[in-house]
Amino acid sequence: MKRRSIVLALILALLAPGLALAADLPTAKPEQVGLSSERLARITQVLRADVERGRIPGAVVVVARKGRVAYVQAVGFRDKTAGTPMTPDAIFRLASMTKPLVTVAALSLYEEGRLLLADPVSKYIPALKTQTVGVERAPVEREMTIQDLMRHTSGLTYGNRGTTEIYKMYPESSNVSSLTLTMDEFIERLSKAPLLYQPGTRWEYSLSTDVLGRVVEIVSGKPLGEFLAERIYRPLKMTDTTFLVPADKRARVAQPLPTHPDTGAEYKLHDPTVPRKFDCGGGCAVSTAGDYARFAQMLLNRGRLEGARVLGTKTVELMTSDHLGQISRGTNYFAGPGYTWGLGVSVREANGLAPMAGTAGDYFWPGAFATYWWADPKEEMVVVSMMQSPLGRHYIPLLRALVLQAIVE
């Protein structure tokens, strides 16, 4: 019976491609945009096999090239426990794929002259002016800046990225903290923790984008979710992207498997229908594959989509350029070799070096719950993959291999 339900879900999912996305972006047959239908089918085959093996509950993958969607597949289950098939309009917890959204919102304020990248963060959040560095509580040599927040060189960290005393003083993540702390309480806790290193001297993945989200609120005078809707979601017709899933969309939320496929440990994600105490810009948004594909296509189009301009072309160029230079990438630089860091995204430096397929100049960022996207200006390609699983890092190089091998001209 269990086997029959899996097969039924897979059949229904395979009938669903394009239903929710066809009206969102123009579509094309793969061969019309230099892709092979036969080779793209390998994506479906691999994901279907992983669903059958109990590795993932399901997935939605979108591949667009030359501005047209050539592949959309919804595979497996939206909720395996309930036996609900995956659909293209499933809503996923984005985790860190929230960060590029908030970075773009901040850059829209930068374009208006309302904040500058070199501004000290304390100009907007005075509580962060008196921070010290390390267990020695050394004074800062210079304050963290807006640019530091966008490129993760602020000196902040995540509490779950280490076991030393400094890490223990930080919140584990904003996904957890925003359920119990207000934004003021969150900032106060950060202000009392020493920085892990001097600002501008090392890359460290961190709560920086949550702080950036607060800066956006202060400068705009609006809650972060409201400002994101005003500057990004409504202009781009991202109708399902938000911080709080409304009651009438609850059934569309994708659910993970109840246990970790490798360890058997319980695996639970937050309920995106439960209100938070603040809009956390580092990882609390939800979206669909179709919505996020529109956002990624806007960036690939250098700031514009269907007549709506979100950013200027030079600002997108600034965002997707190297902002690390000779800054140390530390021991936890999981963007990996061959990639530098721009503003809110990781940017590929060369065709080689990285142990996965790609093109110099492509840019990406994933989410901890197995969401992933990238844009490739040279190949004129946007790819969005949505799952809810603890195995996200496995699928980053795998999806790149499966998608890019389908390019035939």
PLM segments and residue spans:
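Short, well-ordered beta-strand elements
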Residues: 373-374, 379-389
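Short, conserved phosphate/pyrophosphate- and ester-handling motifs at nucleotide-, phospho-/glycolipid
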Residues: 36, 99, 288
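Short, conserved catalytic-motif segment at the N-terminal edge
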Residues: 26-94, 116, 130-136, 268-270, ...
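Active-site SXXK
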Residues: 41-48, 61, 67-69, 92-121, ...
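Bacterial N-terminal signal peptides that target proteins for export
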Residues: 1-8
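Bacterial N-terminal signal peptides
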Residues: 9-18
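Boundary at the C-terminal end of the N-terminal hydrophobic targeting segment
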Residues: 20-22
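Short, surface-exposed loop or secondary-structure junction motifs
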Residues: 26, 132-359
